[in-house]
Amino acid sequence: MRRKRKLTKRKRGKDFMEEIIQEKISADHLLYVSLKYTKTCDVIINLLIRWKKMIETSTNELLKHAKKKKKIPSIPDNPVGKIDAIKILFKKDANFLEVIEMYEMFRKIEELKKERIGEFRKNVTLKVFYRGEEININLEKLKIYADRLEKFISTTKQFLLS
């Protein structure tokens, strides 16, 4: 009979990071391979959904870690409460807050009014209407999002391994 081994703090943090990094690898494939060859808005939507899952996984683990470190009294049950708790935890990190703002849009991406522009063309654009604004999500915007998420993952890793 095998005995279960307890995972050390560092090992658990690495497991969560592996899960987050796997999501990022899948998202990068959508951005740099699938979108390059198909140039459809469906790929953009799937990419945003993939990023949403990655940010969700990260924020859940960040909140669990913060609770263990007694930086927050409890983990909120609802998604809006979790977002608010994360905003308070990382209020000094501007990039982190930008990613959380992006996440709020990504959460609603499937229900938002969207317009597809230039599908199957070089300048494919998904026009999203969010909070009364018109947001054009094209390849340049996606690369900006990808850079922000890269920094977000780095911050997440530092926090989880602290």
Q: What residue ranges belong to the model's regions?
A:
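Charged alpha-helical initiation segments
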Residues: 1-44
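Charged, low-complexity, helix/coiled-coil-prone segments
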Residues: 1-5, 40-52, 84-100
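Charged phosphate-binding loop/patch that engages nucleotide di/tri-phosphates or the phosphate backbone
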Residues: 5, 147-162
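Generic structural signal for well-ordered, non-transmembrane alpha-helical segments
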Residues: 18-21, 25, 45-56, 97-100, ...
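Secondary-structure edge/capping motif, primarily at the C-terminal ends of alpha-helices
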Residues: 27-38, 61, 65, 156-160
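N-terminal interaction modules that seed assembly of large macromolecular complexes
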Residues: 36-75
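Long amphipathic alpha-helical segments
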Residues: 64-68, 99-103, 158-162
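Long, charged low-complexity segments
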Residues: 69-150
